[in-house]
Curated annotation (Swiss-Prot):
HAMAP family: Asp_tRNA_synth_type1 (MF_00044)
Lineage summary: Bacteria, Bacillati, Actinomycetota, Actinomycetes, Mycobacteriales
Organism, as annotated: Corynebacterium glutamicum (strain R)
Record site: Important for tRNA non-discrimination: H31, G80
Gene expressing this chain: aspS
UniProt name for this protein: Aspartate--tRNA(Asp/Asn) ligase
Binding positions for L-aspartate per the UniProt entry: E175, R221, H453, R494
Classification via SUPFAM superfamilies: Class II aaRS and biotin synthetases, GAD domain-like, Nucleic acid-binding proteins
Amino acid sequence: MLRTHLSGELRKENAGQSVTLTGWVNRRRDHGGVIFIDLRDRTGIAQVVFRNEDVAERAHALRSEFVLRVTGVVEERPEGSQNPNLASGDIEVSVTEFEVLNESAPLPFQIEDSSSAGEVGEETRLKYRYLDLRRPVQANALRLRSAANKAARTVLDSHDFTEIETPTLTRSTPEGARDFLVPARLRPGTFYALPQSPQLFKQLLQVAGMERYYQIARCYRDEDFRADRQPEFTQLDVEMSFVDQDDVIALGEEIISEVWKLIGYEIKTPIPRMTYADAMRRYGSDKPDLRFDIEITECTEFFQDTTFRVFKNEYVGAVVMTGGASQPRRQLDAWQEWAKQRGAKGLAYILVGEDGELSGPVAKNITDAERAGIAAHVGAQPGDCIFFAAGDTKSSRALLGAARGEIAKKLDLIKEGDWAFTWIVDAPMFEPAADATASGDVALGNSKWTAVHHAFTSPKPEFLDNFDTNPGDALAYAYDIVCNGNEIGGGSIRIHQRDVQERVFEVMGITGEEAREKFGFLLDAFAFGAPPHGGIAFGWDRIVSLLGGFDSIRDVIAFPKSGGGIDPLTDAPAAITPQQRKEAGIDAKPKPKAEAQAEAQAEESAEK
């Protein structure tokens, strides 16, 4: 090794020892001819001092991010010069000799000054990601991710799970987003697809009798740009045979609990459960943030005889902003712009005065009886503001759900270090295909119905006989785990019977011929004694970003893409040459399947 010790691990107990350190120049200071350098390695910083005239003279040429190897004696710092902000702040190393292992060009941004991090554009940070990762906060994010991987593996290994890698070159099968396609050079005109998830392979592993599988899996989805999404991402993927929903949830809680211990937080288990219907009714979201106690109050029945045209609608609901009646007019106008940015016409409101009198546009248009009872109906007190949404149920609840989150921010109801977990169960099995398309997803099949989770989720047992006759009423045997308003994992009990799977395909408008073409290998496997099975997948990037307190998952990915799937570091994606295009067979017409199979068999025979 080029060093004997690590910079961040030196202590007073090392005083008097001769040590050799290696690392980067984090900061350089010149005090009257004596050079002080903060030497940084992966463990932290140690102050090294160049007092000797020979070494001090040479040290004048050192600059930020030069790579050094220094040898010297550990000394206790003089009284009053200790640095309590450094683990090694009680000592310094008096340098007797040093070697410049490499120099650094002028930096595109300062590394040692963490306060400037917010001033550096993200494109620049990602272009020079190898420099960005020298910052302790960024480097520690990757170390936290590694620790989370280890914690999850420890739990799963203790339950006799087997870690198995599944293919990343497979066939294109519809799973809810567009596939990334890879040309197969040896079969011109045909393409592999990168997997959107290991879903089908992990189910096949259950058919194979593995019973307990897991994988930290890379997944790929060619989606339109959405904030804080990545075209390639990681999930902790788990599948088990001979289990029910409670078994998978219990294991999921054990994994999450162990991971959150990394930041010193003890999750209380069992984690509460909430039905999808309750979540939408009370919070306007299937991933509610429960760190604050604001709920939606349904007012549809209250206003059933109203003369106010706006409230003559399918749905009317409200949320209360405590103390909101004191908001100035410009803030109330800002709420209207906020709502319009979310596709609504506005956000109706009533102000409850300190004397209990109601004011605002809505108060002027409702009946005396409605004015007399609305505050009590929604639980508003003098000084509060009542916000309303009216229209179709889904979009109105979504607007109120977003409003409760905005209210919580404005009232500072979310405290740092608060954690709130819940399971969302009993979600619909199918949704209108138009709704899926409107939200940016790919609606599978050619029907007015598509799967909410995916096509391989089993209906709850009570809907097994009639889910195809009443798709809109069927509930899925599925469960999602939500943390602080973020979905961090989701799973389901899977279909393991061929006839049930074929019925689901029929509901989604996937014909028997198309099902055999796309999923024939899975349907065939179900004919050979597939066991009941279920599983869960955790969004690992999201979990680590929450653990580390990061706003974006990009901060916990070593080399993330920026908006639109661009990699500023390598400038990917990039054009290919005409020769590459020709060799890849992108424009070739694929041979008939039978002919291609015959050629493949002939090639195999020739090799033997």
